[in-house]
Every structure is written in structure tokens, then in C-alpha cells.
């Protein structure tokens, strides 16, 4: 492989499942990348990514999730690697801007993969049961290189279920340290990455200014609560059919009950884990203010990259 990687030279595959806005987002992608291919409705994150890799005809493949709207400059990105870097094992992650809470990080990010690596990896539903790092995410086992410039917006609030599921998944995953659940014998916020702790707090409190933002907060609080304060098996977060059934079981019937549940969970998380939440959340004006002034932490530097443009 070349040490200089141009995204224009890589196949692009749009990966969708059941997102309410997937057709709208795909139509937008085709105005910017008319040659983009598509995988739709494959169960399991590992299996779905392998379907994308099998569709690719290039050594690397760029995979774009179904809730993304890309920035046009994505396709102009060129990444130059250092001499010692091995392009066969590294994944480039371009952060995404989440419209619910303004967070910019790897959730929903566009990723450029070595095609063979995707075919060979075993994660999520295909993970080795003894490997905690691969049960619910890719990032703890694979050589992820975090790119500095964000390249898409994540619109995961097109329905109550989509927003709740997005919040719930992050409420679970932001609790983990390289896939491992913290103990209750030490302060919760000292056991996980500080950036993830800040993101978790934002998921729980910011977003009432957008459609279905309350559902994302409810999901984040419930995901954290079930992971840390019950005996629930957190690896079930990788199974979308499970999450859809869970949503049907726990969804409040009206906004009054929804807000009551958000407040109840927040109080429990504050009292039992010391998380910076509680009854209440940022109102629409406060949420807009947060998104206007909050500075997302810089992504980690990496000596494998000389420059990227």
C-alpha cells in the first residue's frame, strides 16, 4: 500500500440499517459521491462491516453510517503516513458533529478501513467471548487513528426510538474502559477516560432544543443506569433488535412520564455514582448556549501521521 492515502482512491460504502432518515441521507450522499455503494439491513455490526468490505474493490474502504450527512471536503482528504507506519492495520476515524448535543468525537464518525482488516476482524456479535475489548466496539482493539477535522453531521434524532437508541448505546459505552465495566468500590469518574465522562454527562443533559432530544437523554441515563446499577449484561447493547424491543418495553406513553423518568434516573445516577446529573436537564436555551460555547477536546496526536489535508 502507498504511504499516502487519498480518500478519492478508496471505495465509499453507505451502511444503513433501520434509520428513519436513511433514504434522505443516502440521497444527499449521492449528490456528493455519486459512485457510493450501499449495504442495508444487515444484522450485527461486524457482519455489516464485512458486507461493506466484500462490496469494496479497493485496498481501503470508507464506510459512512446511515445517520450521517457528510461535508463535501471529505473526499478531498489526503493522509500521509510516516515511514514506520503500517497502513494495513490502521483505521482513520474522522469525527462527527452530533446535532443533539454538539459533541464532536468518534460516535457516528466516518472511518477509512483497510479492506482485508475488516474481513479478518472478529468484533461485536462475532467477537471472541474472552476478549472484553471487542464485545461492543471496534476502537479498543484495532489501531484507530483519530483525525483532527470533523467531516460529517450525525442526525440520529429523526424519531424517538432512533434518539433513545443513540443515547442508550453511548450511555453504556461511555461507562466502559477498554470494554470493561468499572467497579462500584472506587469513584466512577476516576475509572473511565475523562473525555468519555464529559461526553456521558453531555448526553445526559444537553439536547432539549432539538427534536427528540429528551429521548436521547433518557436513553443515555437508562443505559448508564442499567450497566452500572443492575445485573444487566451490557454486551446486549451491540444487538439492535434487542434495543428495539427494549425501547418498546420502557418507552413512556407521554412527555410527562418521559420527563419523570429522566428525572428519576438522573437522581439515582447522581446519588449512587456521583455523576454530574440529577433531576432536570439543560432547557432549550441552555442547550443552545452549551453547543455554542463548548470546546470539544482535541483528539489524540499520532506519530504515524505526517500530515493530513
Report the location of each language-model feature:
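A general structural motif
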Residues: 7-9, 58, 86-89
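Glycine/Thr-rich phosphate-binding loops of Rossmann-like dinucleotide-binding domains
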Residues: 22, 71-72
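Short alpha-helix within the catalytic core of nucleotide-sugar-dependent glycosyltransferases
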Residues: 50, 58, 72-84
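Generic structural signal for bulky hydrophobic/aromatic residues embedded
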Residues: 55-57, 121
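Short aromatic/hydrophobic "clamp" motif used to bind/position activated sugar donors
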Residues: 61
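Catalytic-site signature of metal-activated, phosphate-bearing donor transferases
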Residues: 79-309
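N-terminal anchoring/stem segment of glycosyltransferases
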Residues: 1-54
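The conserved acidic donor/metal-binding loop of glycosyltransferases
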Residues: 65-69
Amino acid at each position: 500500500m502507498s504511504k499516502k492515502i487519498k480518500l478519492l482512491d478508496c471505495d465509499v460504502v453507505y451502511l444503513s440499517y433501520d434509520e428513519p432518515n436513511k433514504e434522505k441521507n443516502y440521497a444527499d450522499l449521492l449528490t456528493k459521491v455519486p459512485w457510493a455503494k450501499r449495504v442495508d439491513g444487515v444484522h450485527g455490526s461486524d457482519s455489516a462491516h464485512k458486507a461493506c468490505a466484500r462490496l469494496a474493490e479497493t485496498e481501503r474502504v470508507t464506510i459512512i453510517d446511515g445517520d450521517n450527512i457528510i461535508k463535501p471536503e471529505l473526499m478531498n482528504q489526503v493522509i500521509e503516513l510516516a515511514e514506520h507506519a503500517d497502513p494495513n492495520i490502521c483505521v482513520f476515524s474522522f469525527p462527527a458533529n452530533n446535532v443533539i448535543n454538539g459533541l464532536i468525537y468518534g460516535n457516528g464518525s466516518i472511518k477509512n478501513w483497510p479492506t482485508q482488516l475488516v474481513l479478518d476482524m472478529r468484533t461485536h456479535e462475532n467477537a471472541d467471548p474472552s476478549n472484553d475489548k471487542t464485545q461492543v466496539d471496534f476502537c479498543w482493539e484495532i489501531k484507530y487513528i483519530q483525525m483532527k477535522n470533523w467531516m460529517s453531521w450525525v442526525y440520529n434524532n429523526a424519531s424517538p426510538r432512533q434518539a433513545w437508541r443513540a443515547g442508550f448505546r453511548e450511555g453504556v459505552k461511555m461507562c466502559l474502559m477498554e470494554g470493561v465495566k468499572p467497579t462500584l468500590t472506587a469513584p466512577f469518574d476516576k475509572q473511565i477516560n475523562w473525555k468519555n465522562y464529559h461526553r456521558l454527562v453531555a448526553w445526559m443533559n444537553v439536547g432539549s432544543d432539538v427534536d427528540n432530544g429528551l429521548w436521547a437523554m433518557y436513553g443515555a441515563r437508562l443505559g448508564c443506569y442499567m450497566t452500572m446499577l443492575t445485573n444487566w449484561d451490557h454486551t446486549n447493547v451491540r444487538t439492535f433488535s434487542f434495543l428495539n424491543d427494549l425501547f418498546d418495553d420502557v418507552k413512556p406513553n407521554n412527555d410527562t412520564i418521559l420527563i419523570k423518568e429522566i428525572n428519576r434516573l438522573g437522581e439515582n445516577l447522581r446519588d449512587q455514582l456521583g455523576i454530574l446529573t440529577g433531576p432536570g436537564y439543560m432547557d432549550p436555551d441552555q442547550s443552545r448556549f452549551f453547543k455554542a460555547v463548548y470546546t470539544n477536546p482535541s483528539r489524540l496526536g499520532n506519530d504515524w501521521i505526517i500530515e493530513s489535508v
